[in-house]
């Protein structure tokens, strides 16, 4: 068989797969007689209402000299680590706004950072294709820099996201531009499992984000530039447990819902979507039309402790607070006093749900606290 014939057969097979996928999508839509917001309205649910003092900017963390790309909270809620275009990780005291650590990175092109569950170490990765681990208790060297305690090398593309396995300081999961995710043993520095790559059920484009289930740490979700999200079990690296379709652009961010049975995705297509890992169904779409026709990309997301609220950062500087039940925007932090002056690149909620931190290309991080009659939702 000639190369031309092989290409033609491959194209025909690809078209058949796409046609079947579209038929499956339409059949699911026929069987799905309602979505989350439709059911909530039928039950008389009303939107969450925010007053002017219910979520206010209480801290501005200034110290980076470049765009802020990533942030993460410690489990005890008092500290934040941020990664910036200036080639530094900064650990902040969220209560006082003071910097407790400023780590100059071997590679300035950092894209992601994460706190360990104990809060004793931080991980980061970027265009050097390495996930670097720093022990915050290690003494600094003669030049005043924190030494790298472990370098996790093996990816063949940039490291786009990293997250420690809950309740473990010894394992971290990374996603990469090489279309794979990797589970690492930090103690040995070796790869425990590789998800994707040569396996056909893996992603077919750069993987942008991972989220590990807090209720079942063996499960994690990945989002990719192939417009899909995939559910993985760390015990079965050879295949994805389920693939979730629906987006029409790169999936930039994924986040598990608090109950561990659902997860959210955010995409370049301007939408966030809520999926059920048990049925594979899309439960809800969160999209706010813009009159100018411009569609801002979704860059980051986080659920409130109860899951009733969804915080979403956008490329145009908006930061919407969505009511997840009714799919309504109840607040836009990009339109209030002290809002960011650039793209919202990252955000995260404190462990107790009492504060939200946002990071931006304006080089600043801002901490937003629930006030008024709300303490957490």
From Swiss-Prot:
Can you name this protein?
A: Guanine nucleotide-binding protein subunit beta-2
Q: What does this protein do?
A: Guanine nucleotide-binding proteins (G proteins) are involved as a modulator or transducer in various transmembrane signaling systems. The beta and gamma chains are required for the GTPase activity, for replacement of GDP by GTP, and for G protein-effector interaction.
Quaternary structure and partners? G proteins are composed of 3 units, alpha, beta and gamma.
GO function term, MF aspect, one: signaling receptor complex adaptor activity
User: Which ranges does the UniProt record give for the WD repeats?
Assistant: 63-93, 105-135, 154-185, 202-233, 246-276, 293-323, 339-369
| Pfam families on file | WD40_Gbeta (PF25391)
What does the similarity note say? Belongs to the WD repeat G protein beta family.
Q: Which domain of life is it from?
A: Eukaryota
Organism expressing this protein natively: Nicotiana tabacum
Q: SMART domains annotated for this entry?
A: WD40
Q: Name one GO cellular component term.
A: cytoplasm
Q: Which UniProt keywords apply?
A: Repeat, Transducer, WD repeat
Q: Which PROSITE patterns match?
A: WD_REPEATS_1 (PS00678), WD_REPEATS_2 (PS50082), WD_REPEATS_REGION (PS50294)
Biological process terms in GO annotation:
G protein-coupled receptor signaling pathway
């Amino acid at each position: 068989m000639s190369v031309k014939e092989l290409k033609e057969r491959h194209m025909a097979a690809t078209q058949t797969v796409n046609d079947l996928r579209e038929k499956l999508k339409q059949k699911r839509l026929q069987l799905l007689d309602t979505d989350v917001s439709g059911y909530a309205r039928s039950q008389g649910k009303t939107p969450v209402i925010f007053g002017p003092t219910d979520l206010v900017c209480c801290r501005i963390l200034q110290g980076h000299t470049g765009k802020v790309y990533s942030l993460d909270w410690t489990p005890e809620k008092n500290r934040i680590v941020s990664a910036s275009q200036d080639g530094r990780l900064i650990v902040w005291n969220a209560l006082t706004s003071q910097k407790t650590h400023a780590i100059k990175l071997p590679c300035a092109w950092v894209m992601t950072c994460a706190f360990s569950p104990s809060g004793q170490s931080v991980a980061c990765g970027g265009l050097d294709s390495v996930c670097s681990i720093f022990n915050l208790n290690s003494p600094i060297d003669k030049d005043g820099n924190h030494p790298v305690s472990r370098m996790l090398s093996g990816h063949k593309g940039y490291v786009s996201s990293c997250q420690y396995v809950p309740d473990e300081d010894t394992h971290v999961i990374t996603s990469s531009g090489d279309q794979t995710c990797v589970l690492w043993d930090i103690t040995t520095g070796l790869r425990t499992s590789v998800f994707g790559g040569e396996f056909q059920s893996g992603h077919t484009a750069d993987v942008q984000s991972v989220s590990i289930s807090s209720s079942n740490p063996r499960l994690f979700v990945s989002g990719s530039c192939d417009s899909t999200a995939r559910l993985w079990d760390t015990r079965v690296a050879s295949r994805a447990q389920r693939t979730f379709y629906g987006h029409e652009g790169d999936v930039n961010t994924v986040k598990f819902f608090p109950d561990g049975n659902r997860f959210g995705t955010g995409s370049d297509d301007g939408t966030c979507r809520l999926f059920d890992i048990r049925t594979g169904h899309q439960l809800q779409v969160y999209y706010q039309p813009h009159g100018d026709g411009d569609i801002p990309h979704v860059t980051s997301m986080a659920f409130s402790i109860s899951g009733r609220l969804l915080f979403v950062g956008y490329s145009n500087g908006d930061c919407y607070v969505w009511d997840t039940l009714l799919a309504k925007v109840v607040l836009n932090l990009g339109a209030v006093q002290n809002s960011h002056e650039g793209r919202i690149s990252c955000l995260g909620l404190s462990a107790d749900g009492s504060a939200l931190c946002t990071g931006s290309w304006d080089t600043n991080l801002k901490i937003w606290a629930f006030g008024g009659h709300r303490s957490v939702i």
